[in-house]
Amino acid sequence: MAAAPAPHSLHTAPRRIAVVGGGWAGMAAAVSLVQRGHQVSLWETARHWGGRARALVVQDLQGQPLTVDNGQHILIGAYTDSLALMRTVGVDVEQSLLRLPLDLRDAHGHGLQLPDLPPPWDAALGIARARGWSWRDKYALLARAAHWKRSHFRCNAHATVADLCQGLPQRLLQDFIDPLCISALNLPAAQASGVVFLRVLHDSLFAGRGGSNLLLARTDLGTLFPTTAARWLIAQGATLHLGQRVHSLQPRGRDAQSGWQVDGEAFDGVLLATTSAEAARLALTAASALHDTRSACEHWAGLADALPHTAIATVYAQCPAGSGLPAPMVALRSGPGAPAQFAFDRGQLGGPAGLMALVISASDALPVDRVTLQAQTLAQARQQLALPGLEALRTVVEKRATFACTPDVQRPAAHVAPLLWACGDYVEGPYPATLEGAVRSGLEVAQAF
């Protein structure tokens, strides 16, 4: 699929905009700014594009290189902005993503799988056909979903997901609520924000046909968007600096009335698309030279720096060719000594047969050391997936993978200071830390310029 050309400028006077950070949010903002006719310069400290959602090379059991991902990410059909951006930069979405109805079943087929029907019929039929659930379980979930819908998917701001689900049968919590909550918010139900959880349900399960579909990447995450977007940006005339860290951010004129200097280079505006910690560092650098807006900028930096985070780990493992899972994604039963929640058969997603990704979300489930984590996860997968020959290749741990989406978390706003903005999945918004949240944040800030 050929890359779409940049449309004509939406502004009569293009601006010079610096985007600091080449993850999904920064790339989304850069593409949108170029489409609007602005001159974009993009910096990325690492030697790869994509931030936490990027390609990674590991060695298989024979010592041969394999391209995987820094962490196994799931997209869903409701990720409309991400899908549109992929198409803009030339990604063949239909070939690059495997679309499946929502499937949270384990290796024995127990749990929920939705049919390919429009809502609410998909949920109603999926719940009615769920294996391993009693009719009491099914009625309880349908009744609770109807209650959430009557409440317009709103709840008390301080409520957790556990509060929303109080009284539901344990089987439903184990087979549906917990896997969905951990995969979407990366927190157990007792800690996760009820408000955000209901928003995710509304915008995926109840938004329209296909919104809850799983979209599993058949290629590495770098090719899926950020690396491909970098090539598109270069073709459109943007300036990209890979492997270069921004050290200095200074205002031009009193309180940046004339813009900013990024490492001595003048720009009309700056967009911080880094991690929250790095954005806080740059904001403090900027605040030191501000006057009337200094305290506001320092306050923003304090919020960004104080955000609590949770970890995600991925154990890549391989079993003899010919071994595999009944579906590309299978739920695992987690608990003490069994930390993983999902297994992905990468052999069904464009990778070599027998390659598995075992995902451990929610930091409470992570053992203290990586060796114990890998051993426990491997033993769990061998037993629950009936793969005794499974051997570990590499364990990847992102200690600050996502901000902790608790009911009372204070997320910083997108506006930092005059002509200085921030974007990322941690910035104030209705969604948890997801790829779509990052992309939408980048697009919204680009529009603000």
What are the residue ranges of the model-derived segments?
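Helical element adjacent to the flavin cofactor pocket in flavoenzyme catalytic cores
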Residues: V200-R252, A256-W260, G269
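Conserved flavin/dinucleotide-binding core of flavoenzymes
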Residues: A2-H8, V57, P115-P118, Q341-F449
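N-terminal Rossmann-like FAD-binding beta1-loop-alpha1 element of flavoenzymes
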Residues: R15-L42
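Short beta-strand to alpha-helix junction loop
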Residues: H73-T80, C155-A159, G208-W232, V368-L373
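Extreme N-terminal leader/targeting segments of oxidoreductases
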Residues: M1-I17, Q35-R36
